Swiss-Prot record:
Cofactor: a divalent metal cation
One of the GO BP terms on file: nucleoside phosphate metabolic process
GO terms for MF: bis(5'-adenosyl)-pentaphosphatase activity; guanosine-3',5'-bis(diphosphate) 3'-diphosphatase activity
Function comment: Accelerates the degradation of transcripts by removing pyrophosphate from the 5'-end of triphosphorylated RNA, leading to a more labile monophosphorylated state that can stimulate subsequent ribonuclease cleavage.
Identification of the protein by name: RNA pyrophosphohydrolase
Organism placement in taxonomy: Bacteria, Pseudomonadati, Pseudomonadota, Alphaproteobacteria, Rhodobacterales
PANTHER family: NUDIX HYDROLASE 26, CHLOROPLASTIC, UDP/ADP-SUGAR PYROPHOSPHATASE
Motif (Nudix box): 45-66
Enzyme class: hydrolase
Amino acid sequence: MERTIDPLTLPYRPCVGIVLINREGLIFAGQRIDSPVPAWQMPQGGIDEGEKPREAALRELWEETGIPAERVEFVAKAPDWVTYDLPPELLGRVWGGKYRGQRQKWFLYRYLGTDEEVGIGTDHAEFSCWRWIGAEEMVAAIVPFKRAVYEEVVATFRPHLA
């Protein structure tokens, strides 16, 4: 018998997102390694128990891009948390079925290194390739159920973006 999940009874997974910009204000976009179709996104991930959001952001950046904290400069933090809900076809299939979506705190960092220093082939690899893109292209490239979050994040950090 198939179990029906009521998303309203599930919490949001606490997460962080990182808008990483280069010197020109272009955004780091990674192609998800687990997607057979184009699915570009910015680095993001869960906040571990006892971890502060900013610590989680720097850890996730390292895990997903190989970029250490010393190679980025903090620029801004979004004032509010943003949420998204998983679409019905993913509900119960990701994160052990424990969450209805994510509640994210977003950070903007400027990358101080070179493209050659980016290393997406980490122990926690999430991207198969990466590139620098403009804000509108980033919003257009994200999966539809996360698009409203990306629109809000881009609007928040607009003065710093190309």
